[in-house]
Structure formats: structure tokens, C-alpha cells
């Protein structure tokens, strides 16, 4: 019996334009996995498509077919063993040839493939592996032409993309370039074995009181002969300590056993408890010899989506281990247009940044990819819950038999691959495809429950979302929650705020409402909303190489903003709210102020609504990240540099947060007449699971003088309810008497100042914010850490620190009021480094 061995084929590859027959056409590939754009860049054949207008000069790559080749030695194959060629992912139309013979054809980027090549490698010595990648751009157009009866409609990119199981954003999106990659985008290897564990999974049943858990462990086994002489030894461990061991025989090709765990340690989202991960290991043995061994980590937890009738309609919120959790977080797009650029370390940094920002959920958006294992592993370990879309986005997908078969395989493969991750708490059928159905007037009769009839309508994709995918989820992960689409709610119009989840784009897109009323526009769960902002100057310096192009409306900057109508939308929100500027650095800052304020108004109000019978169950901003250096809705740019909005969201999502706001007065529709009076409200939100006693203070500070215009209001011994909202007080501002002033709120618990909020008169453009008397004093310094004290004579709006690589500030986008010194810790800034630059409104 030969034990399992594998040989990764990462070196020795070459590639060429498939149509180039010249002898010097072959170019070297530095390493695999890779995609063709990287390999062309490595050979000096392509300029970086992320710089300037280079995306345009890279378009020729999109229209070519490519061939990759590797000459390898046949590995040693013990008697009774077979040899398999394994691809974890091929992008996308791939024909694989071994020594000139076709052994595999693939047309789905999201599938892995295994080919038994034992007979093909009968001859010892060298063998030639060749992969032809046909042009996906042209193949998609051919497929669309072959199916004229289908209604090819959608948002973003060429609608021919709907015919191909490839990352949809490769066709371009309203935040990303058109870069049609091709290549071996995941690992390729040779596996030699007589027996192999092909799958290992667990099913966890947790007692309602959490006193015990029953874990069923199962392993699927593949053998090259009779399998009944093998046994499987399962081991359950926690933090390296074995807590259970069981031996099972094979029943067919599956071995199963159970473990009972008393007083189990549970997996929790960050901020609610530990992210405990157990390890299940299985060893496949025959006659005391080990043939193969596999381990996976998993968590013990329950995850529910609570949808029940209430006074607001029908709830939509998450309950983990019996605890209701407000899901503040963000949507995730692929972190690079060239996917093989992304390292496990980069994934880890993204997820750790979310936890630093008090975010507990990330939504893997349906126009990208089922993410890499290291992404989900980071989410498991850091405690970020995953909302997982299936890979369908913004379109009316076709359903001819071959593509349905491919989609079913794709769904089952990725469900199996990812089912052990406790962070994944929901599977969702698509992104905005029901909105395409609504806007295009496609047939959707929710009362019709016959899946076969859906295939005959002009919206056949319903069959995928309401039949094929839920069936696959039920088959592979029976305990998982499935939701047909995002947004979607019981078959009602997707903008219905009373049910399901909602994408609220009437700030920025749509009716372009004032961001100050964002919280009034939400629904039961706000799974998309956003506001664009420029990235920091250091990021713009990276892709704008000509100094003459560094002005706000330059061609290069417009080219790197893919959102339709971005000029007028950015201009609208700037002109409505701020004194505008043409200097690029100031302009960047102003767009960032607008984004930070927009996110704050949305999250602050929606989190408050959580305490009103779970009126709002969560808010996932669009978007966390970028796939290239660009101007977009991201709150952290391509280089992991947070924009001010990141810090604004972080403060609002702290375990304890205080909120104060005056009622909105729409100056644009009242001839800019000021209101005579304004009501204001003060409240505290808590995600803590126990009641706490706090002290609350509200001050009224003149913007002009920095002096108090009224006595402070102080409430001692305030009982703050757990996991909800505590309304503290309300009042009225008399504008005939009171000069323009801020409402400055603070919260103390056990003598510690834990939260602040400052409400300002709107809009900022009417305020004189000069001569603020800001002082920034360094009060402590070590080789790698500095603490700054911030104070001001008059209220300061949105103090933003420069973002430098490998330097982290504990807070930014800060409002400062007199008599309330704040402290910011800077890590990674050395003694010899120049101090961080900063900006504030009116500077």
C-alpha cells in the first residue's frame, strides 16, 4: 500500500498567445497559480494596468486565447496506487492535454477537477501538460448569440457575461476595470495514492442550554481497490489537546462516528465571546499503516435568521448561540482584479481591520468569487460572520441544461468546501437579480410554486435561486439558512422596507436624498448602501504619475472612477454640504468628510432602531475594499489605507455608543430659511449582554466662541439596557435665542469615559470654522508608539490624520470640543519619522 503523496506543479511553466506559432512565442511563468496579466507583466510585455490609463492598452489581452505548458517527471507510483492530476481552479474555458491527448475540458472557474492519469503515464520519464485557455470574452458573446430567445439584461458589464461561470466583475463593474483574466488561478498538483480521504465534515447539535454538544464526524473515502479493509480513526482536539478518539469502519465509502462534548466552548462573533475552534482529524489506515490523514477546524455554535411578524412588518436579524446580534459590517468585493495577487496575509489584514473597527459581518458579494480558504479561516479566527452570496450578480441568468448542470456542481462543490467554517451564517442566492427582474419587467409570480414553469418564463433564473440552490444547501448543509437573493423579502418588491433585506441607494443613486436622513430610508436589514470618497493622496500618487493630472476633474482621475454619473453625484453632495475647493488634497479631504458623515448618519440611526423591537437587524455598507487603486465607495482603499469613514463607523459600532442629533431641516427646499426651533434627542446603544450603570452629559457649545451657551445637562446613575437602546432625553433648540452651537454628548461607565458624539448644525458650509485653536501635543513616545493629546478652544470638525503604510492610528475623523481632551495612539511611527500630517474642516 502506498501512502498518499502530492507533488505541486508550481514551477517550470511557460505560456504563449495561442495564435502565435513562432518558435520564440513561449515565455516563462514565474510561478503558478497565476493569471496571464501577471505573467505578461513579469516578461515585460504589459504595463501595470492599474496605473494611469494603462487599462486601455491592456484590452488586447482580453481578446486573446492563451496556452500554458509544463514538462514534468512522472513521480514514483507504488504498486496498487494511482496518480491523479488535480486542478483546484481553471480560469475559465480550459482544454487540458497530456502528451497531446485531451484529458479534461472545463468551462467553470468555480469548480475543481480531478483526472486519473495512471494509464496516461505508463511511460516513465518526462510528460508534457498543456492547457489551452480560450478567450472568455469572445466565447461569452458566441453563447449569447446561440441563445437569442433568452432576455439578456442586467446592470454592469457586457450582458454576455451571464452565460459564463466566471467572476462577473472581470467584465468591468462600477468600481473596477475590464481585465479578462485567464490562467491556472488555483493550485495544480499530482496526487499519488491507493486510498484517500476525499471529504471530512461535521454536523453539530448543541443543546439549548449549551451544556453539551453532539458532534457527528464523517469522512468520505476513495480507494483504488476494495475499501472494506480500511478503518478510519477520528480524533477530536481543542487547542492541541485530544478530547476524544473513535475508530470507525467504512460503510460503503463513508466512515462516521459521534463525540459527546460536555460544557463545550462556543464560537462567537468578535465582541461577544471567544472564537473557539475545535479540530477534527481522521486517519485512514490499513493493517496499522496510515494511507492518508486530513484535519479541519470547526466551531460549535448555532446560527439563526429570525423572521417573525412584528409591529414594523417582519423581522430580519441574526441570532448566534441564542443571542440577538446587530450585524454592523461591510460588503466585500474581490481584493484584486488579478486574484492571484492576494496572499493569505493580505486576507488576514483585511479581516483584522474589520474587527478593529467593531464590524462583525462581511458580505461576500455575488459578482466575485467563492473566496479562498485563508479568507474564511481569518473570519473564523477573528470572529467576523460571513454572509455568503452565490456567484450571480445583477443579471437575468440563462438556464439551458448544460449551464444548470454546471451551476449545480459548482454549488455543491463550494458548499462542501466551505461547510466547516463557523463564520458562514447565511447562504444567499444572488446579488440584485430580483432588482433586474423588477426594472426590466420580467415575469415573477410569487404565488406560482412550480419550478418547471419558471423555466418557461422570461425570468428563468428564478429556478436557480428558488429551486436549485436551496436544494443544494439542504443536501450538503441541512442546518444552514438560505435566502433567495439580496435584496429579497417574501417575493415582495425589493424596496419594501418591512420585510427581508434591502439595498438602499437613494443616497448617492436614485433620488439622491440628503445623507442626514439616511436612517429614515432603511429597512429590516440594510445589506447595501454607500457614498463615494477619494482615497488618500498617497494612493492617488501611485496611479497618477503625471503631476499635471493631479487636479479633481482630470482625465486619469475620472477614468479611475467607474461609477456612472460620479461627477454630478460627488458635486451634489459636496455643494449641498461643504465649501468646495479645487486643490486636489483639499478636494480629497472634502469627499472623505461627506463619506464619513453619510456612514455615521446611517449606522447611528439604524443601530438605534435595533432597540425598537429589532426594527433594523443590521447594516452592511457598500463597500469595505477595492480591487485596484481607484475612487469608489470603499471605506478602506486597495492598499489597506482606511478612509475617515472607517473610523466614523468604528465609533458608532463600539459596544457602548452615545448618540445625539437635532431634527433634520432641509435647507435646500425651504429657500435656505433657517428653522425657528429644532427638537433634539439623546440616547445610548449597547451590545453588551448585561445591564450597566452610566453617567451621561450633554453640553451646548458655541461654534463661534467655544463657550457654553446653556448649563450642561447631566444624568447620573442611568440604567443602560443590554443589547438595545436607552433613550435618555429630548429637548428643543430655540434658534431665535441660541447662536449656532454643537450638542456634545459623553458617556461614562465605572468612571471611564467610553463614548462621545457631537451633533452639528447643518449644512457645514454655512458655518465659520476658522480659528479653532486646535492643539496637538505629544505626551508620550517610545520607539514604535506615540500618544497625542488633542484639544481645542472652539469646536473642531473631522480632524483626519495622514495614513502611512505600517502606521496605525487609534482614531481619526475626530470631532473635538473645548474642555474635552482626547488621546490618539500612533503605532509604527518611529522617533526619526516625520510627524503625521492632518486636516480638519475650515483649516
Swiss-Prot record:
The active site is at 432 (proton donor). It catalyses: Hydrolysis of terminal, non-reducing beta-D-mannose residues in beta-D-mannosides. SUPFAM superfamilies: (Trans)glycosidases, beta-Galactosidase/glucuronidase domain, Galactose-binding domain-like. Pathway: Glycan metabolism; N-glycan degradation. It is an enzyme of class 3 (hydrolase). Optimum temperature is 37 degrees Celsius (at pH 6). Transmembrane segments: none annotated. The keyword Hydrolase applies. Keywords: Carbohydrate metabolism, Glycosidase, Hydrolase, Polysaccharide degradation. Its EC number is 3.2.1.25. Pfam families: Glyco_hydro_2, Glyco_hydro_2_N2, Mannosidase_ig. GO terms for molecular function: beta-mannosidase activity. Optimum pH is 6. Active from pH 5 to 8. In contrast to clade A beta-mannosidases, which are likely secreted, clade B proteins appear to be intracellular. Belongs to the glycosyl hydrolase 2 family. Beta-mannosidase B subfamily. This is Beta-mannosidase B. The gene is mndB.
Amino acid at each position: 500500500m502506498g501512502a498518499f503523496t502530492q507533488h505541486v506543479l508550481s514551477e517550470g511553466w511557460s505560456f504563449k498567445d495561442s495564435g502565435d506559432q513562432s518558435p520564440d512565442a513561449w515565455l516563462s511563468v514565474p510561478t503558478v497559480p497565476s493569471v496571464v496579466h501577471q505573467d505578461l507583466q513579469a516578461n515585460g510585455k504589459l504595463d501595470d494596468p492599474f496605473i494611469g490609463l494603462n487599462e486601455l492598452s491592456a484590452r488586447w489581452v482580453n481578446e486573446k486565447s492563451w496556452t500554458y505548458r509544463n514538462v514534468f517527471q512522472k513521480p514514483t507510483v507504488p504498486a496498487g496506487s494511482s496518480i491523479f492530476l488535480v486542478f483546484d481552479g481553471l480560469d475559465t474555458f480550459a482544454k487540458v492535454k497530456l502528451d497531446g491527448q485531451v484529458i479534461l475540458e472545463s468551462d467553470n472557474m468555480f469548480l475543481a477537477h480531478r483526472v486519473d492519469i495512471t494509464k496516461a503515464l505508463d511511460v516513465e520519464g518526462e510528460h508534457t501538460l498543456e492547457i489551452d485557455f480560450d478567450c472568455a470574452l469572445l466565447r461569452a458573446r458566441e453563447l449569447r448569440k446561440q441563445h437569442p430567445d433568452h432576455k439578456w439584461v442586467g446592470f454592469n458589464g457586457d450582458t454576455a457575461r451571464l452565460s459564463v461561470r466566471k467572476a462577473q466583475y472581470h467584465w468591468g463593474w462600477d468600481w473596477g476595470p475590464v481585465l479578462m483574466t485567464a490562467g491556472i488561478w488555483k493550485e495544480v498538483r499530482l496526487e499519488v495514492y491507493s486510498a484517500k480521504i476525499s471529504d471530512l465534515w461535521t454536523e453539530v447539535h448543541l443543546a439549548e442550554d449549551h451544556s453539551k454538544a453532539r458532534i457527528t464526524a464523517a469522512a468520505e473515502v476513495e480507494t483504488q481497490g476494495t475499501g472494506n479493509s480500511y478503518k478510519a480513526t477520528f480524533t477530536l482536539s481543542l487547542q492541541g489537546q485530544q478530547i476524544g478518539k473513535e475508530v470507525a469502519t467504512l460503510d460503503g465509502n463513508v466512515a462516521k462516528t459521534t463525540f459527546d462534548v460536555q460544557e463545550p466552548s462556543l464560537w462567537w462573533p468578535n465582541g461577544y465571546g471567544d472564537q473557539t475552534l475545535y479540530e477534527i482529524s481522521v486517519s485512514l489506515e490499513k493493517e496499522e499503516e496510515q494511507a492518508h490523514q486530513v484535519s479541519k477546524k470547526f466551531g460549535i455554535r448555532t446560527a439563526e435568521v429570525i423572521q417573525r411578524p412584528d409591529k414594523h412588518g417582519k423581522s430580519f436579524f441574526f441570532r448566534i448561540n441564542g443571542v440577538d446580534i446587530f450585524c454592523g459590517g461591510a460588503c466585500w468585493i474581490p481584493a484584486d482584479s488579478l486574484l492571484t495577487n492576494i496572499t493569505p496575509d493580505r486576507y488576514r489584514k483585511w479581516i483584522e481591520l474589520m474587527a478593529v473597527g467593531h464590524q462583525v459581518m462581511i458580505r461576500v458579494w455575488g459578482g466575485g468569487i467563492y473566496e479562498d480558504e485563508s479568507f474564511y479561516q481569518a473570519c473564523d479566527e477573528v470572529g467576523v460572520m460571513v454572509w455568503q452570496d452565490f456567484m450571480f450578480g445583477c443579471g437575468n441568468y440563462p438556464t439551458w441544461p448544460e449551464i444548470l448542470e454546471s451551476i449545480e456542481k459548482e454549488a455543491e462543490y463550494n458548499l462542501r468546501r466551505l461547510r466547516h467554517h463557523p463564520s458562514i451564517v447565511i447562504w444567499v442566492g444572488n446579488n440584485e437579480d430580483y432588482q433586474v427582474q423588477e426594472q426590466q419587467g420580467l415575469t415573477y409570480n410569487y404565488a406560482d410554486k412550480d419550478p418547471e414553469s419558471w423555466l418557461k418564463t422570461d425570468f428563468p433564473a428564478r429556478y436557480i435561486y428558488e429551486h436549485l440552490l436551496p436544494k443544494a444547501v439542504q443536501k450538503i448543509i441541512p442546518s444552514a439558512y438560505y435566502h433567495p437573493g439580496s435584496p429579497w423579502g417574501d417575493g415582495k418588491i425589493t424596496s419594501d422596507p418591512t420585510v427581508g433585506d434591502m439595498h438602499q441607494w437613494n443616497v448617492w443613486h436614485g433620488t439622491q436624498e440628503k445623507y442626514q436622513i439616511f436612517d429614515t430610508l432603511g429597512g429590516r436589514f440594510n445589506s447595501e448602501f454607500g457614498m463615494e470618497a477619494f482615497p488618500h493622496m498617497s494612493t492617488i500618487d501611485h496611479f497618477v504619475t503625471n503631476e499635471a493630472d493631479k487636479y479633481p476633474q482630470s482625465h486619469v482621475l475620472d477614468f479611475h472612477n467607474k461609477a456612472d454619473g460620479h461627477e454630478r453625484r460627488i458635486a451634489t453632495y459636496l455643494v449641498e454640504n461643504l465649501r468646495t475647493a479645487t486643490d486636489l488634497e483639499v478636494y480629497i479631504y472634502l469627499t472623505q468628510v461627506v463619506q464619513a458623515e453619510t456612514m455615521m448618519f446611517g449606522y447611528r440611526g439604524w443601530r438605534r432602531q435595533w432597540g425598537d423591537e429589532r426594527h433594523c437587524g443590521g447594516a452592511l455598507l457598500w463597500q469595505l475594499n477595492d480591487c485596484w487603486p481607484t475612487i469608489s465607495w470603499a471605506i478602506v482603499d486597495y492598499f489597506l489605507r482606511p478612509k475617515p469613514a472607517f473610523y466614523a463607523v468604528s465609533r458608532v459600532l463600539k459596544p457602548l455608543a452615545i448618540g445625539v442629533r437635532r431634527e433634520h431641516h432641509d435647507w435646500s427646499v425651504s429657500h435656505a430659511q433657517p428653522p425657528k426651533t429644532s427638537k433634539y434627542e439623546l440616547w445610548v446603544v449597547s451590545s453588551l449582554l448585561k445591564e450597566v450603570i452610566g453617567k451621561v452629559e450633554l453640553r451646548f457649545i458655541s461654534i463661534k466662541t467655544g463657550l457654553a451657551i446653556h448649563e450642561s445637562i447631566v444624568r447620573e446613575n442611568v440604567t443602560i439596557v443590554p443589547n438595545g437602546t436607552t433613550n435618555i432625553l429630548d429637548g428643543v433648540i430655540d434658534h431665535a435665542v441660541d447662536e449656532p452651537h454643537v450638542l456634545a454628548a459623553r458617556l461614562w461607565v465605572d468612571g471611564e469615559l467610553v463614548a462621545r458624539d457631537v451633533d452639528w448644525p447643518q449644512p457645514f458650509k454655512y458655518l465659520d470654522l476658522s480659528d479653532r485653536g486646535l492643539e496637538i501635543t505629544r505626551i508620550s513616545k517610545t520607539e514604535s508608539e506615540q500618544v497625542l493629546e488633542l484639544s481645542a478652544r472652539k469646536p473642531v470638525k473631522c480632524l483626519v490624520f495622514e495614513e502611512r503604510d505600517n502606521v496605525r492610528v487609534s482614531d481619526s475623523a475626530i470631532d473635538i470640543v473645548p474642555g474635552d481632551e482626547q488621546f490618539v495612539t500612533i503605532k509604527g511611527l518611529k522617533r526619526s519619522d516625520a510627524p503625521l500630517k492632518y486636516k480638519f474642516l475650515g483649516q
